[in-house]
Design a protein with these regions (language model features):
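Short beta-strand scaffold positions
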Residues: 96-97
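Acidic, PIN/NYN-like endoribonuclease modules and their adjacent C-terminal/linker elements
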Residues: 103-161
Length: 161
């Protein structure tokens, strides 16, 4: 089971792979993350379109009310905090986020493995659903869509391949 926050869901939808992710994995998120997706979907840009794409699949992933302890800090917003709580409560295998700065704190809060969304591409390769070349191309598309080029998250993601 994977718990994914807003940023990870947007990234996966932005590279036209969200359908495949939903077929291969049991995806969960929080009500707060869905609210953030709804806010983002209001924008007429690539992130808004990706957020809308996630929302169009709302019936294919599980949304939980995880707002009872919704943790926030200078590095963790409400969506990330609620997803960390959710991952801990559900005993998720992974919490997926694209907020590299928040990774260590989310790891402590969630009590599970925390990774950036390109780990899902790596998992799809291991499952023989994507080949290396296709996954690498999706990573490059994510880097462009999410403005990751030359950033630490892009470097970390490339290390997966």
């Amino acid at each position: 089971m994977i718990v994914a926050d807003t940023s990870a869901l947007i990234t996966l939808a932005s590279i036209d792979i969200f359908d495949l992710v939903l077929e291969e994995f049991d995806i969960h998120t929080s009500v707060t993350a869905v609210e953030e997706l709804e806010d983002t979907a209001e924008y007429d840009d690539s992130h808004g379109k990706a957020a809308d794409g996630v929302l169009q699949h709302r019936d294919q992933f599980t949304v939980h009310d995880a707002s009872r302890t919704e943790f926030q800090s200078s590095r963790i917003d409400g969506g990330e905090g609620s997803c960390a709580d959710l991952a801990r409560d559900l005993g998720a295998d992974f919490l997926i986020t694209d907020d590299l700065r928040a990774l260590p704190e989310l790891q402590t809060l969630s009590g599970t493995q925390v990774a950036i969304s390109p780990i899902v591409l790596r998992a799809l390769v291991k499952r023989d659903v994507l080949d290396e070349e296709e996954a690498a191309a999706k990573l490059e598309a994510a880097a462009e869509n999410r403005d990751w080029l030359e950033s630490p998250i892009y470097t970390k993601a490339r290390d997966l391949f």
